[in-house]
Amino acid sequence: NGLAMQKFRPQGHEIGLPVLKIKELRQGSCDDSSELCSLSIKPEYIIHNGDVVFSWSGSLLVDIWCGGTCGLNQHLFKVTSDVYDKWFYYLWTAHHLARFIAIAADKATTMGHIKREELAKAEVLIPCEEDYTSFNSIMQPIFELIISNRIESRKLAALRDELLPKLMT
């Protein structure tokens, strides 16, 4: 789970790191209106391109972050595994998302959220090692390409936004 980044503001002349909140996760990138946090936060709270991020409170969603390096705010999980590849846990999280949303909506009094116990109840089918290796040989390159294309698309959009005003004058 992320940090309450308002407690970790940049100090002095520190440039700061954009904060990844639900708004940024929805739009796929941080922008000039994104809050900043200190660069000295622990590494586990820093999100990089290709990290899987799950919003568990308010707006429930999961995405592969490709919006640049930023600090992970509270109400967001950085989803990782020491055993399984990114495509595997991303797709299983996405598979369960509709059910998580329904659970949060049923329990919502103000802002819906999902509890860890509900996440723990989510079942995942794990293939045998041979099948997993076969799936991985197909899925891993696809996910690497998706991430690469999304990063390139963001860079090209930024370049367009920078050059277009110059071309119009």
Predicted regions mapped to residue ranges:
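A short beta-sheet element
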Residues: 21-22, 41-98, 104-107, 115-116
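Short capping/connector residues at structural and topological boundaries
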Residues: 8-13, 25, 30, 35, ...
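Amphipathic alpha-helical coiled-coil/heptad-repeat segments
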Residues: 84, 88-91, 95-99, 105-108, ...
